Amino acid sequence: MPEITLPDGSKKVFEKPVTIQEIAQSIGSGLAKATIAGKVNDVLFDATLPIDNDSKVVIITSRDKDGIEIIRHSFAHLIGHAVKQLYPNIKMAIGPVIDNGFYYDIFSEYRFTPEDLIKIENRINNLIKKNYDVEILQVTKKEAIKTFQERDETFKLRIIEEIPDEGLINLYKHEEYIDMCRGPHVPNTCHLRHFKLLKLSGSYWRGNSENESLQRIYGTAWAKEKELNDYLKRIEEAEKRDHRKLGKKHSLFHIQEESPGMIFWHPNGWTIYQVLEKYVREILNKNDYLEIKTPQAVDKSLWEKSGHWDKFREDMFTTASENRTYAIKPMNCPCHIQVFNQGLKSYKDLPIRLAEFGSCHRNEPSGALHGLMRVRNFTQDDAHIFCTEEQIQAEVSTFIDLVFEVYKTFGFDEIIIKLSTRPEKRVGSENIWDKSEEALMKALDNKSLKWVLQPGEGAFYGPKIEFSLKDCLDRVWQCGTIQVDFSMPIRLDATYIDLNNEKRNPVMLHRAILGSFERFIGILIEQYEAKFPIWLAPYQIILLSITDRNIEKCLKFNQLINSKGYRSKVDIRNEKIGYKIREATIGRIPLIAVIGDKEEQFDSVALRALDGKNLGIFKLDDLYKLMNNLIEKKGRTE
């Protein structure tokens, strides 16, 4: 007679083992119809499995976060059901849930096309309409092997081989189709309604390019039709803003096969990069950072001392010269300690803040590369603060202010903060972990900031705070971080003389605001849809001649404007002025200045904004004042 305790504290006693579906029915038929699964003593549980013992039970519907995850996982199995009906000879690999959706990796000699995707989606819709029950079979490992041997599902058999012999394996039966999963899954396809198959891509078994090539089908699913439609609109908008497309369209950068994951910056894109670097440098200078530059290639002995050789050797590019092996640096921290170590340091010298626009290389898998967002060569706005334990809180507090100042400049007002604390495997005393975690928490709390605790998610060498920004499409990008490090200063012999004239190791704070220039510029391209604010735009103003008579004045004004430090260009082609204005608008140039006979007569320009707003007639001195004001605001309206 299991006693079931519900979330409101009420209890129900049943005469025999009971399912979550039956518990829901005892509360109400409406809840029973909506029930997808449940939690039994905080463990996810299928709606149709019996509960034998006294338990705490939570009923899950599509309104719950766990509910939508279960729906998405069930849709992945539906892909398998549909694809196996349409293409019986294919083999199913894995089909997990991902952010906002799901995918299934499939081995097939036949190459799927977008037309096949439509066919598969139609078959899924037909299966959903049948409202069939999804049956769960709990079997032994031996029985699972037999099941998938009969179906010649080689990838499933490989997965089963890795499962311990003891215990039961969950198989989910969709009519004639059987798949395996930890579960839970929906009890009936009536819960599967609002979905869309999105795209095809390639992948490899276990993500290893030396293994079999697979084909991946991506999809999304939601509890309500409106949620699905809203998401599809966001996808459409994201495709329109794709930095790779806009980068090509506006000649910002390109990537080519001869140098995968490394950026060829064009003049327009490099201008944005340089303006961004100048801005960050000004921020660093205002906050007493010392800018340094360290070598690209460093003997492997330093990486062995720092511990990176053992942990990250496979991610490093290496080269050899005169019987010595060098690593192209994947990060800057060991080199910054070498700069700190030059000369004796006193506690009076601390904190010392060393910053570098450090170019790093990491041998990312080719399949993971993605435009500017995931590259092999990137530049970090990297800095390391060498300080005492007592200075951690003040340094972190100042850094938090910097992060918010910079993100606000670019229009990012919603910042998500996560604090990661000590993992099980760690270095350093409990005392210093206590002090460090308390310092980070106090720095956040003293500013009345909301933050999320991630217990055990810190690095082995110290706790950290991560700063993620939310863009105009509600996507979250983790960019900034500040990380406490007790380990590396010890490993690389960084010391200072304390108040008692004794040598001590400083604490090192790793910190970055943008993360990498490449990725941050990619985010900005998509955030602004390449309509950069005037301070950041490759060209800030374009001068258009109406007739050939106005070309000379156009060129003269252009020279004067550029001599003042603005970024200006001309369009003096023999084209109609309407066409030139459209071209300048498509080119995303913030200010468009037209010069005709009337403007030339009064030594002025007719100015319009990128959005088409007529700003009026301006003489050059007034134009400079306007541009200075817009540039100083950096696109902010307050």
Swiss-Prot record:
It catalyses: tRNA(Thr) + L-threonine + ATP = L-threonyl-tRNA(Thr) + AMP + diphosphate + H(+). Its cofactor is Zn(2+). One of its GO terms (biological process) is threonyl-tRNA aminoacylation. It holds the Pfam family tRNA_SAD. PROSITE patterns: AA_TRNA_LIGASE_II (PS50862), TGS (PS51880). Its EC number is 6.1.1.3. The keyword Metal-binding applies. Transmembrane segments: none annotated. Residues 242-533 are annotated as: Catalytic. It comes from the Bacteria. InterPro entries: aa-tRNA-synt_IIb, aa-tRNA-synth_II, aa-tRNA-synth_II/BPL/LPL, Anticodon-bd, Anticodon-bd_dom_sf, Beta-grasp_dom_sf, TGS, TGS-like. It is found in: Cytoplasm. Residues 1-61 form the TGS domain. GO terms for cellular component: cytosol. The keyword Transferase does not apply. Binds 1 zinc ion per subunit. GO terms for molecular function: ATP binding; metal ion binding; threonine-tRNA ligase activity; tRNA binding. It is an enzyme of class 6 (ligase). Catalyzes the attachment of threonine to tRNA(Thr) in a two-step reaction: L-threonine is first activated by ATP to form Thr-AMP and then transferred to the acceptor end of tRNA(Thr). Also edits incorrectly charged L-seryl-tRNA(Thr). Belongs to the class-II aminoacyl-tRNA synthetase family. PANTHER family: THREONINE--TRNA LIGASE, CHLOROPLASTIC_MITOCHONDRIAL 2, THREONINE-TRNA LIGASE. This is Threonine--tRNA ligase. The gene is thrS.
